[in-house]
Structure formats: structure tokens, C-alpha cells
Amino acid sequence: MNAMNPQHENAQTVTSMTMIQALRSAMDIMLERDDDVVVFGQDVGYFGGVFRCTEGLQKKYGTSRVFDAPISESGIIGAAVGMGAYGLRPVVEIQFADYVYPASDQLISEAARLRYRSAGDFIVPMTVRMPCGGGIYGGQTHSQSPEAMFTQVCGLRTVMPSNPYDAKGLLIACIENDDPVIFLEPKRLYNGPFDGHHDRPVTPWSKHPASQVPDGYYKVPLDKAAIVRPGAALTVLTYGTMVYVAQAAADETGLDAEIIDLRSLWPLDLETIVASVKKTGRCVIAHEATRTCGFGAELMSLVQEHCFHHLEAPIERVTGWDTPYPHAQEWAYFPGPARVGAAFKRVMEV
């Protein structure tokens, strides 16, 4: 998968990295480049994070730059808002995206609104990292994908990478950005490529093939989608883990699908979406989160508004079920290639 127009400082060596390693590299680089960057959250210091994304950073930069926080998501986000308003660039980790709800008031009423409320006198340049989605059989309290909750909040950016290269470049771009950012990290992709079919554990000690990632500083532009698979028959709008499911579905059906990895969910790269749908005349939207009021509903609305006269078939949406994320039946909940491929065939039959 190719990032669009990556901003490299100069030519540099590359290393095979998992997404965890790429995220750690991004934080390492930014801690070294900018003394205003601080990293904190539950267990991110001495322990290195529950998924080891921050492993070794406290030892390298000290307890004043990388430190643990109490089990209080509201307190973590509230502290980050204050730090950002007074000149720091906090990078905080919410241990699981499912845990963020107690911090909703701090995120929505404070972080997202402070620039507006102060007429631009204060900014909140903080990045909130959150592991999301399934992949660890964590059940309803360790598997949610709450992106739709954040994309409707004016003043927040919402980002979700699908590969190590984008994860590093996007995280660096988010940390340098002056807006508060929700940075969602699909757990199923933490430790290696996902073929769309077979579940794999994401424990830090599991070894899987990784991707080639530049060792040094680079940025992937925010608000730009990536066409990861060009095609002419139909457009697939997706992000995160579902990028790989869409690719598997295209391979299995043999259809010439154009797969777009949104990467930045909000602000959205509407230009790329509209150009693709007008070209293909058909659109399938796929995400892991629940269906009702999910982000796919907004995507459907935008495609309908901007591409109505170019559509050759009704828009299809493939999502998780409108139930809590199950424990033992995780794979039955997850929208796999069979369901996505069936949607491909339906839009082609019209």
C-alpha cells in the first residue's frame, strides 16, 4: 500500500516494522525533535503500554517526558487539554478505545471547542491514541470501534491507519498538527499483515511479517485518502482492518474493485471519493463498527448527495452487527470477505 505524497526529510534507510514498532518509532522521533512533546497514559511508562507501543521510551527520555497516569480517562484527557493550551504537545494513550467514554466531556466540550471559545487564543495540539476493534477476543469492553462518535464533533480530527508506513507518517503529522486528534489503531493489525480471513493474536511476543518503513522522520498528509487498489467496476470506501477484507473480497470475486483507504476519517478526502464513484458508478462501504448511525451512514449520504446522477446501483453498506461485540463469536461478528464480496456482487447485478 502506498501513502500519497509522503513528506520525507531526505533519503533514508528502511526497516521491516510492525505497526507497533512504527508507532513507537514515530513517538521516539518526536520526543527527540521537540522538547514540548510528552507521552503519558495508563501503563505507558515503565511497562511500555499494554501492547508495548511505548516500550523503552521512558528509559530513554525520562519520567518527566514519558510517564504513567492514574486509571482516570477523564483526568488523562483533562490534563492533556491543559498541557496543550499552555504550549506542550501531549500524546496520550487510552488503553482501549472502549475506555474513552468517561472522557467524553473533556474531549467534546474542552479539547474540541477551546480554540473556538477563545477566538484562537488557545489551541490544543494533543494526539489521543486508542487501540480499537477486535482481534484479541476481548468481548464488548475491549473491541469497540467508536469512530462515529468523534467524526461528528466539530474541532476534532479522526485518523485510522491500516499499515505500518501510514501509521508512523500519520502519527508524526498528527503530533505536529495544532488540532486535537483521535488516532485510532486497529488491534488486529498491530503485529503484522492481515489477509482478511484468519484471525491472529496481537500479543507483543507474536512474530509476523512486517512492512518496510523509513527509519527517520517523514509525514503522511492528513485529510488525504489512498487508492490502494485501482479499479473500474466499483468503488469500495473503507479504512483500518477492513482494507484487507476488501482486498480479499476483490480477489475472491474477481471484480475490478477500486479500494480507497480513507485514512483520515474527518476531515474527509471527499474529492477522491467523488472522483472514484463518478468513474465506477457503484459503491460499497465497509467498516467493522456497528451499522446504525455508524460512519458508513455518513459516507452513504455524501455519496448520494454528490454522485446521485452517476450511480448505476444502490449503495451497499457492510458493517458489524448492531449488537455488543461478542467474545467467543468474534469472527461471526466481524464482517469478513464473504459478506463484503456478496455486497460487491449485488451492486454489479443491477
Curated annotation (Swiss-Prot):
Keyword terms: Oxidoreductase, Thiamine pyrophosphate
EC category name: oxidoreductase
Cleavable signal peptide: none
Keyword Oxidoreductase on entry: yes
A Pfam family matched in the record: Transketolase_C
Gene Ontology terms, MF aspect: 3-methyl-2-oxobutanoate dehydrogenase (2-methylpropanoyl-transferring) activity
A GO biological-process term: response to nutrient
Gene3D superfamilies, per database record: 3.40.50.920, 3.40.50.970
InterPro entries in UniProt: THDP-binding, Transketo_C/PFOR_II, Transketolase-like_Pyr-bd, Transketolase_C
The organism's place on the tree of life at top rank: Bacteria
EC numbers, comma separated: 1.2.4.4
Catalyzed reactions: N(6)-[(R)-lipoyl]-L-lysyl-[protein] + 3-methyl-2-oxobutanoate + H(+) = N(6)-[(R)-S(8)-2-methylpropanoyldihydrolipoyl]-L-lysyl-[protein] + CO2
Cofactor: thiamine diphosphate
Listed SUPFAM superfamilies: Thiamin diphosphate-binding fold (THDP-binding), TK C-terminal domain-like
Subunit note: Heterodimer of an alpha and a beta chain.
Function in brief: The branched-chain alpha-keto dehydrogenase complex catalyzes the overall conversion of alpha-keto acids to acyl-CoA and CO(2). It contains multiple copies of three enzymatic components: branched-chain alpha-keto acid decarboxylase (E1), lipoamide acyltransferase (E2) and lipoamide dehydrogenase (E3).
Protein name: 2-oxoisovalerate dehydrogenase subunit beta
Organism encoding this protein: Pseudomonas aeruginosa (strain ATCC 15692 / DSM 22644 / CIP 104116 / JCM 14847 / LMG 12228 / 1C / PRS 101 / PAO1)
